[in-house]
């Protein structure tokens, strides 16, 4: 690989460029019409203007692929956010002979859909949270709520969700309809899909994620864990690696479960498999998988002394 187009902006674009340059790879930046003075452009070897302004310019697959072909980029790194988990973007890159730095299209299709990800976990005998596990109507949601023991709480999630958007905690059945309406609207705006599913809301659990890495040929490994329980509005605020709350037994069980899920799809690149852990009841449940580089990857880099972005590029 001699040239890499970085399909992002800001901090993550700069982070990727640093690792690419360390590997002797030419870096190519992109920018929207209103990002002409953005800092990330000064860190690239070359830059190309995208048509349009704002966020929409960085979500235009056709335009970005066109630029990649024009500048003869050999690979594309999507960073995080924007098109990083879009299977269509991965497909178009590979179709045009450009390496996609990330998981394959088929993997993104599974992990980008929270229901499909839960189905995979169940298939691999990894426990999941009790829920509807399918696109759910208001009537089905009401039926599910009634099936739980008295005093239970429900959480609404977007099927295509991420980043805490499209999520609502419902403490009473009478609040269900209004919460569904709000969550559906938010999911539609954020992900282009209003589809929702429902789970029992588990309180007083630790949120633990296992960092995984795979080469796409059936070899996968783990890069230990991160504790991300401290959150506000479902957004992670503080991450600690390794988790100070995990017992050795639980750590081994979570790692084994994460690797089984990754092996099932011949995982390629970096990703995280996330769990809720209740150490009082000695149980854990799979929540979701993120098939991309995460903002908090630097926390893991600090404890291992590895450059995870370099690893991504080398695998690609």
Describe each region flagged by the PLM.
Residues 1-124, 136-143:
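ATP-binding N-terminal substructure of ATP-dependent carboxylate-amine bond-forming enzymes
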Residues 2-27, 47-49, 69-71, 102, ...:
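ATP-dependent carboxylate activation and anion-phosphoryl transfer catalytic cores
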Residues 137, 171-172:
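Alpha-helix N-cap recognition
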Residues 131-132:
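Conserved beta3 strand of the protein kinase N-lobe
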